[in-house]
Regions:
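Conserved N-terminal segment of class I S-adenosyl-L-methionine
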Residues: 1-72, 175-179
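A short SAM/SAH-binding and catalytic strip from SAM-dependent methyltransferases
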Residues: 69-81
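S-adenosyl-L-methionine-dependent methyltransferase catalytic module, highlighting the catalytic core
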Residues: 3, 81-89, 95, 99-185
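Short amphipathic alpha-helices and their capping/turn segments at secondary-structure boundaries
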Residues: 17-21, 87-92
């Protein structure tokens, strides 16, 4: 199923990530598998609750903080209790020059998996990333959506599947999803 809510975000994000040269990147993905098959040098998935970014950076068997070139969090941050703490922990796990990519919903139904805590616009994501230590000049954030997509989110079953002819025009005043890439200095 191609989710209507994710179709624009995924295309833009895949283009961003491809521009980084995936074959050179060691990647961590938090509670997801979207990055599988992108041709990374290495890709590890870290799933909650065994790996909770709110409790600290991920560590190896020797207790050393693991380091990555890219950390991905796709539709996860809205489900964690302490996103500011988690984002600071992500910053600690990035190598110098490493990237954090995060995508979150804004205008969609409540969906507890196991909880549903937060929503962000592009500006909200930018502020979250700055507060975690990222330099504002190294952050790119976007949002996308429109009233048509918002109405489709009221349908069941949810989430809505993309249908040929769905309006993908962006209405900046009606975001459905937001995403950002931030680079550690």
């Amino acid at each position: 199923m191609r989710s209507l809510n994710r179709i624009v975000m995924q295309k833009a994000s895949r283009d961003w990530i491809t521009s980084l040269g995936p074959e050179r990147l060691d990647v961590a993905e938090i509670s997801g598998r979207w990055g599988e098959g992108m041709g990374f040098r290495s890709h590890q998935s870290f799933h909650y609750p065994r790996h909770d970014p709110c409790t600290g950076p991920f560590r190896d068997e020797a207790g050393k903080v693991q380091k990555f070139d890219l950390i991905m969090a796709n539709q996860v941050w809205e489900h964690i209790d302490r996103p500011h703490t988690a984002t600071r922990n992500v910053y600690r796990m990035l190598r110098p020059g490493g990237w954090f990519w995060v995508a979150v919903p804004f205008f969609i139904p409540y969906h507890a998996v196991p909880v549903d805590c937060s929503r962000w616009t592009a500006r909200g994501l930018t502020n979250l990333l700055i507060e975690a230590g990222f330099d504002e000049a190294r952050i790119q954030a976007y949002q996308w959506g429109n009233r048509h997509v918002a109405r489709r989110n009221l349908e069941t079953p949810w989430p809505p599947e993309y249908r040929e002819g769905d309006d993908l025009t962006n209405d900046p005043d009606f975001p459905v999803v937001a995403w950002a890439m931030a680079q550690r200095g």
